[in-house]
Regions:
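Rossmann-fold dinucleotide-binding core
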Residues: 58, 67, 87-166
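Hydrophobic beta-strand scaffold residues
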Residues: 26, 40, 105-107, 148, ...
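Rossmann-like NAD(P)-binding element
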Residues: 41-75, 79-90, 125-126
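Helical "substrate-binding/catalytic lid" subdomain
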Residues: 156-203
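NAD(P)+-binding Rossmann beta1-loop-alpha1 motif at the extreme N-terminus of oxidoreductases
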Residues: 1-53, 57, 78-79, 115
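Short glycine-aspartate micro-motif
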Residues: 2-5, 81, 106-108, 126
Length: 203
């Protein structure tokens, strides 16, 4: 089955390449096609015409809404759209509701792992959507990543990503505050690092 991939930037391009390496035929689209000349590219209408599974990796919710506004009316019913962008929950729910009107399933599946994870196929996918659609897409997640978790219905993937990022942010703030306190107490940072690395403060 030919897979569509919209958004071939720092994350999208290596994800698409891993699908190609696994033997899948892929048709891509990006606003800067010269950056990924090794991936066959065409237009959004062509992708909608030829692909029943279309993955996107876009920079923000506004871009997602604009792309899906063009894409959804062009897709055949039963097409599955898989958005791996990190966007706001409201945008994820909006495109899901619009797609549902056309009998098209949307899965929100933001990732964790960064560019290295995208290149190595070790991403974690936080997935929101219907289980039937997830079951069809899970084998592709397994190619692009090491783990995928169905977190709930539409929008649940983006909700999980926000919570994950909150934990990361709070942890970073805690580490910074601890080292700031160490400096005020004239405690050597390297010695504190050695202690924390093998103690309960390790995170």
């Amino acid at each position: 089955m030919k897979i569509g991939f919209i958004g071939l930037g720092n994350m999208g391009a290596p994800m698409a390449r891993n699908l190609i390496k696994a033997g899948h035929e892929l048709l891509g689209f990006d606003v800067a096609p010269t950056n990924v000349g090794d991936i066959t590219q065409d237009s959004i209408p062509k992708i909608a015409e030829e692909c029943r599974i279309i993955i996107s990796m876009l920079p923000d919710g506004n871009v997602l809404r604009n792309v899906y506004e063009e894409l959804i009316p062009l897709c055949t019913p039963k097409t599955i759209l898989v958005d791996c962008s990190t966007v706001d929950v409201e945008s994820a729910l909006h495109v899901s509701k619009e797609a549902e009107k056309n009998s098209i399933a949307v899965i929100d599946a933001p990732v964790s792992g960064g560019v290295v994870g995208a290149e190595n196929g070790t991403l974690t996918f936080m997935v929101g959507g219907e289980k039937d659609a997830y079951d069809q897409i899970e084998p592709y997640f397994a190619i692009m990543g090491q783990k995928s978790v169905l977190c709930g219905g539409p929008g649940a993937g983006q909700s999980a990503k926000i919570c994950n990022n909150m934990i990361l942010g709070i942890s970073m703030i805690g580490v910074c505050e601890a080292f700031n306190l160490a400096q005020k107490l004239n405690l050597n940072w390297n010695r504190l690092f050695d202690v924390v690395s093998t103690s309960s403060g390790s995170c």
